UniProtKB/Swiss-Prot annotation:
Lineage of origin: Archaea, Thermoproteota, Thermoprotei, Desulfurococcales, Desulfurococcaceae
Gene Ontology biological-process annotations: ribosomal small subunit assembly; translation
Keyword Protein biosynthesis: no
Protein name: Small ribosomal subunit protein uS19
GO molecular function terms attached to this record: rRNA binding; structural constituent of ribosome
Source organism, top-level taxon: Archaea
Keyword set includes Ribosomal protein: yes
Assigned protein family: Belongs to the universal ribosomal protein uS19 family.
Gene3D superfamilies to which the protein is assigned, alphabetical: 30s Ribosomal Protein S19, Chain A
GO cellular component: cytosolic small ribosomal subunit
Protein's job: Protein S19 forms a complex with S13 that binds strongly to the 16S ribosomal RNA.
Alphabetically ordered keywords of this record: Ribonucleoprotein, Ribosomal protein, RNA-binding, rRNA-binding
Organism listed in the record: Ignicoccus hospitalis (strain KIN4/I / DSM 18386 / JCM 14125)
Length: 139
């Protein structure tokens, strides 16, 4: 009998979330795909470092039972195991989109979950909507 997906325990490259949280960053980096591994091996820039400090502070506040809102423009930050459980608001160029971090997001970039473009929904063409509508008979 196959176990339903909801019952399966999350694993990232064979490691449980608890193992990932205890693991040093250098060991975790080796589990990532090449693009993310290269990005993290080059180190964190100032904006990413500030975001990590906010995440660590928010984790401490969560343990006390408080809810902390983190807002960031840093879309190129790789999601780390320490971020799981937090809600980070990521800027998409117009507004901050709340992103609830779940274990399945580990190894992806924050920007992947805050889309910058929306599907354009055009209205009905009417009089003076386009140049060619000048020749449409008025109702």
């Amino acid at each position: 009998m196959e176990v339903p997906a909801a019952w399966k325990k999350f694993r990232y490259r064979g490691k449980t979330l608890e193992e990932l949280l205890e693991m040093p960053l250098d060991d975790f980096i080796e589990l990532l795909p090449a693009r993310q591994r290269r990005s993290l091996k080059r180190g964190f820039n100032d904006a990413q470092r500030r975001l990590l400090e906010k995440v660590l502070k928010a984790r401490k506040e969560m343990e006390k039972g408080k809810k902390v809102k983190i807002r960031t423009h840093v879309r190129d930050m790789v999601i780390l195991p320490i971020m799981v459980g937090l809600t980070i608001e990521v800027y998409n160029g117009k507004e901050f989109v709340p992103v609830k971090i779940v274990p399945e997001m580990i190894g992806h970039y924050l920007g992947e979950f805050s889309h910058t473009t929306a599907v354009v929904k055009h209205g009905e063409p009417g009089l003076k909507a386009t140049r060619s509508s000048l020749f449409v008979a008025a109702k």
